[in-house]
Amino acid sequence: FPHLGACLDEAQLLGHGRRMLEAVGVAVRHMDHLRAALSPLADLHGQVLRVDPANFPLLIQCFQVLLASHLQDEFTVEMQAAWDKFLTGVAVVLTEKYR
Amino acid sequence: MVHFTAEEKAIITSLWAKVNVEETGGEALGRLLVVYPWTQRFFDNFGNLSSASAIMGNPKVKAHGKKVLSSLGEAVTHMDDLKDAFAHLSELHCDRLHVDPENFRLLGNVLVIVLAHHFGREFTPQVQAAWKKLMSAVAIALGHKYH
C-alpha cells in the first residue's frame, strides 16, 4: 500500500478497508457466480496491482480473527468452516488471472 | 532464532494465564478437523468424525486437543529456546507421525481464531501479532528436525 505512506492515515485505512468489505459483499451476493461477479477485480489484482498471492491467506486469517472476536458465540465452527471456504474461493478467483 | 520483546512476552503470558487448556485445546483441534477436513487423515482411530457436532463432541478429539495445547504451554515458558524445547516433538512428528509441517501452520492459525473467539475485544491487533509470532515460531521449531 505505497499510496498510504509510511504512517498509516486512519481515514485512508478505514476507507480502503470499507472498499474491500463492500467487494466481499458483492461476493456474498454472487456466491454461485464468483468468477463473473469478481472478474473486474480479478483483472485489477492480476494485471494492475499484482498483489502477491501469498497475501490473500494472511488477509483471510485477519478477517476471521475479526469475525471471531466481534461475533464471539455466534462464530460457531460451522460459520468458521463456511467463511474459510468462501473467502478461500474468493481469493482463488482474484488470483486466477495472474498469468 | 526468533526473538520476542519483553512486551510480546508479557502479552503472551498474560493471555495464556487465562486460557482453559482443556477446553481450548479440544476446540482448536476440533475446528481444525471441521474446517480443514483432510486433516482427519491423521486421526483414523478417533471414532466418529462424521459431522461437525460429532467432531466437536468427540472425547478423543478433546483429549488430544488438551495434549497438544499443553505442549503449547511449554512454548510459552520457553520462548527463548523453542528449537530445543520442541526438538523431541519435531522428530516424533517427522519420523513417526509423518505430519507435513504445513499442518502446524494451519493449527496455529485456527488457535489464533479460537483465542479471538474467546477473548473478543481483548484480542487486539497487538495481542494477535504477538500470538501469531509465537505460533509461527513454534511451527518452525516443530519443522526443524525434518529431513
From Swiss-Prot, chain B:
Pfam families: Globin
InterPro entries named in the record: Globin, Globin-like_sf, Globin/Proto, Hemoglobin_b, Hemoglobin_oxygen_transport
Molecular function (Gene Ontology), one example: organic acid binding
An individual GO BP term: hydrogen peroxide catabolic process
Keywords carried by this UniProt record: Heme, Iron, Metal-binding, Oxygen transport, Transport
Residues holding heme b: H64, H93
Subunit structure: Heterotetramer of two alpha chains and two gamma chains in fetal hemoglobin (Hb F).
Known role: Gamma chains make up the fetal hemoglobin F, in combination with alpha chains.
UniProt record similarity statement: Belongs to the globin family.
Protein name: Hemoglobin subunit gamma
